Structures are given as C-alpha cells and as structure tokens.
C-alpha cells in the first residue's frame, strides 16, 4: 500500500512538472511569435517607406565639381629673325568639370557622359586627371617648340532645367589651338529621374517619321520659305536631323552647333518643334511619360 502511494505521488509530480513546462514553452512560443510578427510588420513598413522614398522625385541642386583645371602663361624668347613674327606669350589652359547633385546614381551618370573618350567608353575620375595632365604637358612642350597664341581645351557640365521627373543638362565644350578663334558647342542630356536613364533620340521619336521630322525642321530653318533653298548655309539634301535635342515647355529643341547649319559668326542654332506639332511623331511610350503636355500650343 505504501509503495503504491509513493508511485502515485511520483506520477502526480511528473505530470505537474510536465504541465508547467508545457505552459512555459507555450508562453515562450507565443512571445516569439508576437516578436516575429512585430518585426515582420516593421520590416514591411520600412520596405514600403523605402519604396515611397525611391519614388519621390528629387529637386536638382547642382554644384560644380572640378576634376582638372590648370593654366599658365608661357613667355616666349624674342625671335632672332627680323621677318618672323613670334608672339611674346601664349596662354595654356586645360580643364574638365562635372556636377555634384548629391544624388549618387545621377552623379555617376553625368561623370560617365562627360568622361567618354574617342571610342565612346567612359573613364574614371583618376583616369581623366591622368589623361588631362598628360595632354597638358604635351601641349606645353609643343608651345615651347612652336610658339602660338595659346591652347585651350575646356569641357564642363551645366544644369539647364527640371520639370518633375525630367532633368536637362548640357555639356559645354571649347577648343582653341592658336587659330583665329576657337570652336565650341553644346550637347544636351535629357535624364528621366524616375527610370534613372538618359532619353535617347530613339526613345522619343517613331522610326518611320524621319522624313516628316526633317520637313518640319527644314521649314523652321528656312523660316517657312523666307530663306530660299539656294540661299541657305546648308542645302536641303545635306540637311540632317540632329540627335542633339532637349525637351522644354514650348516643345522639342534641336540644337545645331557652329558650322552645322550656320556660320561661325551666327553661332549655334536652335530649331523648335512645338509639342502640339510634334505629337504625331512621338512614340506612345514617350507620350505616356507626360514630361510635358503635348496637346496644346500653350503648354506649361
């Protein structure tokens, strides 16, 4: 009897201990489940906030970011030949600069565009500095051997304007090597801040509308017939549709640099096709972006 009672007490104790352990384990599991649920909710909220932040279109605030800028005045010795003209000095200047927008991907994109070399491949900042220093040293050597008025190679980026998700930049370039004057120009960059990509000519225009596009540009070039074809700087056959363009409130601006369709004295030329006039030439995908309204000639 005593032995049976002891066995019963042991079993009761075991069940009691096991029951307590089950309750504690259950409580622990419930607490862990709540913690996991809370962390999951917080993670989802952070992900949502991040996605919203990424969709926010930043306002561009651009500052010059000089990569290389060096200049000096080189004094030339007087020529020993009376009939030979040698300038007393020549100015040497090499510079390249990009922009700092505090938007990392945009800064990288702009640097890649301004750093492209002859084969179209972008160079690193370090490579640019090395290349410009080498070119500077070679130019200085040439000037000392054959005195000229100067050499100037300038390349920089400028911020033009922004409308929502569209930002427009331009690359300015100027080159002078001792002639009567230097030659400069502009190349525009249209950047979609939402897709983080450059807008190319093919992104904007339908491929089967080239002839119509050329006709519209030619009309504006000749001022709707005011300038006769034979009087134009460029003949109609030689006239080309440039892929150097930018988007603005009044339409699409096609930019022709000096000597392309006008003389040096006349400078760069811009031909504008109004949005309402260009709508039939534009790709549906481009129109869906709604960078600017295209259905009215009073687009803002």
Q: What kind of region is each of these model predictions?
A:
Residues 1-4:
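Positively charged n-region of N-terminal signal peptides that target proteins for export
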Residues 6-11:
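Sec-dependent N-terminal signal peptides
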Residues 16-19:
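C-terminal motif of bacterial Sec signal peptides marking the signal peptidase cleavage site
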Residues 21-300:
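Compositionally biased intrinsically disordered regions enriched in Thr/Gly
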